[in-house]
């Protein structure tokens, strides 16, 4: 529960735009899974199953509230250990982190979501494709778009790995 709660809450918040509602949705999903735990051995990939359940419940909640469904990642918690000892380097590190967060937030919504799921939540392309009902190729393309835009935004030329 605690391992996935933070990631699932951020994911649901991106859909419903309310942290409290997102926490309620995630809690409801976990309660539902607990109540139906005898079927857990039938689920092949539990983490993916939970993400899909959260997505479906969040969309259902929006429909109940007659709101337009948009997927957005506005609350990305980026944690960075301070690698620098002197205050000047710490300020520069903080400014760099802010620049990266701004660049991530300026990505197109789908590219931002794919980037978050792949890089922050460490999901595989196939899991992302299943979760978002898109092809693996679309996941690859969206991640490529995100990485190119981020590289341009932070001033690093984009180079493919050899």
Q: Which residue ranges define each predicted feature?
A:
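Amphipathic, Lys/Arg- and hydrophobic-enriched alpha-helical face
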Residues: 1-19, 36, 104
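Residues within the DNA-recognition helix of helix-turn-helix
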Residues: 4, 142-145
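Structural recognition of an alpha-helix C-terminal capping motif at a helix-to-coil junction
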Residues: 10, 24-31, 44-56
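Sigma70-family region 2
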Residues: 30-45, 64-65
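Arg/Lys-rich amphipathic alpha helix in sigma70-family domain 2
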Residues: 38, 52-71
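Internal acidic/polar
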Residues: 68-92
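Helix-turn-helix DNA-binding module
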Residues: 105, 109, 113, 121-138
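C-terminal edge and immediately downstream basic/flexible tail or linker adjoining helix-turn-helix-like DNA-binding
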Residues: 130-131, 147-162
């Amino acid at each position: 529960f605690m391992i996935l709660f933070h990631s699932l809450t951020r994911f649901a918040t991106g859909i419903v735009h309310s942290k409290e509602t997102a926490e309620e949705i995630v809690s409801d999903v976990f309660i539902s899974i607990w109540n139906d735990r005898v079927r857990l051995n039938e689920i092949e990939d539990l983490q993916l199953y939970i993400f899909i359940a959260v997505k479906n419940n969040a969309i259902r909640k929006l429909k109940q509230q007659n709101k337009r469904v948009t997927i957005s990642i506005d609350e990305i918690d980026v944690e960075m250990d301070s690698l620098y000892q002197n205050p000047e380097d710490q300020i520069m590190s903080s400014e760099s982190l802010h620049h990266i967060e701004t660049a991530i937030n300026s990505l197109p919504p789908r590219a931002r979501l794919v980037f978050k799921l792949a890089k922050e939540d460490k999901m595989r392309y196939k899991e992302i494709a299943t979760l978002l009902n898109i092809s693996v190729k679309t996941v690859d393309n969206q991640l490529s778009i995100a990485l190119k835009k981020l590289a341009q935004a932070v001033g690093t030329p984009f180079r493919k790995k050899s």
